[in-house]
């Protein structure tokens, strides 16, 4: 007759020595415990993790143990579902033998596989973004292929813009023509400027101030005086002189 209690106690002792940092006893009757399983580090030291809870049934290992995912980190819902299916399959295959180590090892491998899938998915997303950016750059460089439809659309827009430019230019030329002075207007403008200058001088009268410093060196200038020149001839050469 199988002593299920002894087999369970022996396995618990083995599990505690194998997983000293992740094994936790929850209760002794019925025997219940958790084991935390962590994947190997992936890209950027990212990991996925789950804590498995096991409870021995009365006739374990001839009956499968009760199991559940007690907690998890960085796992999607479909990952959790896959792990539970894996546990069910492994439990059936190992029925009649102590199996907790086998179940935990299978989950460990599954977590490593999930990390690899995450890495692959991110690499594919990165490549897809690079491809989209490259295609956008090519489209920008080569431009949009010309079709009858987009050419007619462009032509209509171009003609409308050209018409607006012509209207603006005509308006500016018309305005410039209105502001252009005739010959008579230019003459009257010049005459008015002369009159205003004369009026300014008359209004200033004796109030006009002269800066004498401008003339302070005039005495030092050697002005040529014809009478002081012994060779001076008041009659210009070539002119007719009469007594």
UniProtKB/Swiss-Prot annotation:
Residues 142-197 are annotated as: Interaction with DRG2. Residues 10-114 form the RWD domain. The gene is Rwdd1. GO terms for cellular component: cytoplasm. The modification Phosphothreonine is found at residue 144. Protects DRG2 from proteolytic degradation. Residues 209-231 have a biased composition (Acidic residues). The modification N-acetylthreonine is found at residue 2. PANTHER family: RWD DOMAIN-CONTAINING PROTEIN. This is RWD domain-containing protein 1. The keyword Phosphoprotein applies. It comes from Mus musculus (Mouse). SMART domains: RWD. Belongs to the RWDD1/GIR2 family. Pfam families: DFRP_C (PF16543), RWD (PF05773). GO terms for biological process: androgen receptor signaling pathway; cellular response to oxidative stress; cellular response to testosterone stimulus; positive regulation of androgen receptor activity. The keyword Phosphoprotein applies. Keywords: Acetylation, Phosphoprotein. Residues 208-243 are annotated as: Disordered. Interacts with androgen receptor. Interacts with DRG2.
């Amino acid at each position: 007759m199988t002593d299920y209690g002894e087999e369970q106690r022996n396995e618990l002792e083995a599990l505690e020595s194998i997983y000293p940092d992740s094994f936790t006893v929850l209760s002794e009757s019925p025997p219940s415990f958790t084991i935390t399983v962590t994947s190997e580090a992936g890209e950027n030291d990212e990991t996925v993790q789950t804590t498995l809870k096991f409870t021995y049934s009365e006739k374990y290992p001839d009956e499968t143990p009760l199991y559940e995912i007690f907690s998890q980190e960085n796992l999607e819902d479909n990952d959790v579902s896959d792990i539970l299916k894996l546990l069910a399959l492994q439990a059936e295959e190992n029925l009649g033998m102590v199996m907790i180590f086998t179940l935990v090892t299978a989950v460990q491998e599954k977590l490593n596989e999930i990390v690899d899938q995450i890495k692959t998915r991110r690499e594919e997303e990165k490549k897809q973004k690079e491809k989209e950016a490259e295609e956008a750059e090519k489209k920008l460089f080569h431009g949009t292929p010309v079709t009858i439809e987009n050419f007619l659309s462009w032509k209509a827009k171009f003609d409308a813009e050209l018409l607006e430019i012509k209207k603006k230019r005509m308006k500016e030329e018309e305005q410039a023509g209105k502001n252009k002075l005739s010959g008579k207007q230019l003459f009257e403008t010049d005459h008015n400027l002369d009159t205003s200058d004369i009026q300014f001088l008359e209004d200033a009268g004796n109030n006009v101030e002269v800066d004498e410093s401008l003339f302070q060196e005039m005495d030092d200038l050697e002005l040529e005086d014809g009478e002081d020149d012994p060779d001076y001839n008041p009659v210009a050469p070539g002119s007719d002189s009469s007594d």
